[in-house]
């Protein structure tokens, strides 16, 4: 039975039960704090009373942690704890005065300790799960837009709370914990993550498991990607699937509606170094898919995603210049293009041109566009860059690119990317134009194919000239 209550009294404009001792009183406060005017006029004494109830109820949880047989007696305490957290959570909404009052009572430390106790219980009770969720919601709200509260939350919660909750089986607990981490992180605290990489990896895993949850995604895109040091340290410890997840977010950042700022560009140049080196080290992993065509090799899929990132990076004019002079990158791209082109000709495999659509789950679908993206990357690297134009010629890359122009369902838009690459290879480069013109004269390049691609060969005296017409397909 609920303890008897004194008649309600008015405190600073809010009708509250006095003293606050029972569940009904807490529920009344929770409802009152849904209104902004009530939050703004709440006296600090209310939060002291709520904290007293929270501390008293915590003893039952501590006892259950020491003696599992006591878990069945937790129901009433969990109800009170839940309502305390709801009350405090609501009180903090867009009200820095209440956030400060609650923080100064050391309620944050009590709440974090209690949440960690919940994780220790490891029992399946809906009431426990609800209290757990409400506790995390309170910590998120008390820290929201309040730097002092964020600092206190970080002191108490890092690293134990994040280690305990980011991998919790309940998706709401993962989401609320991610909200706390997102709210509390800043440049200085990112250094703490570098020393606790498992937390950063858990965030990647959380996004992988719960892609619909916005908080893990925002942590990665808005915090992790601003720290090249963290990304590099973390990348080496990620599983292949986690690497794919991270690279997908890098792509999302590159192609997003918001353009990269100057600060972003300097950071992404560092990321570009990691991506380019990783691709150069692993690019031949795609060949594993030819020996085991029914196996989804994650290493190969990472290589495919690395190429996708490089294509998007070189589509950004601010990042292009850095990658155009990246040592060994062009050579490696030409090398892997030549290898998969030859492998595709030798026997029927996933790199052979196909005129039939594949089911989404097929491994052919996983490698879709790889060859055309290699040609796209070559075209990007040659954009207004004579050194790279000449390098492709020296590596016999021009015949290779022209020979890759067959229609291929595994490589949509192959023709368009070949045209794009040829255009960038020959722009203001008479030597490369001569190479293609002579290939046509010698029968090594199909004139009808060149015309279809938007080029034609004209004779001027003893010279052959490659010209583009107005019907060049768009890239």
Swiss-Prot record:
GO biological process annotation, one example: neuron projection development
SUPFAM superfamilies for this protein: ARM repeat
Keyword annotations of the record: Cell cycle, Cell division, Cell projection, Cytoplasm, Cytoskeleton, Methylation, Phosphoprotein, Ubl conjugation
Residue positions, PTM Omega-N-methylarginine: 10
Keyword match Cell cycle: yes
Phosphoserine modifications at: 12, 77, 430
Residues with the Phosphothreonine modification: 82
The UniProt record lists the keyword Cell cycle: yes
Domain of life: Eukaryota
Effects seen without this gene: Embryonic lethal; mutant embryos display gross morphological cardiac abnormalities or developmental delay, the walls of the heart are thinned with an apparent reduction in trabeculation. Mutant embryos also display neural tube defects with a thinned appearance which may result from a lack of cell proliferation.
Family note: Belongs to the ataxin-10 family.
Protein name stated in the entry: Ataxin-10
Lineage: Eukaryota, Metazoa, Chordata, Craniata, Vertebrata
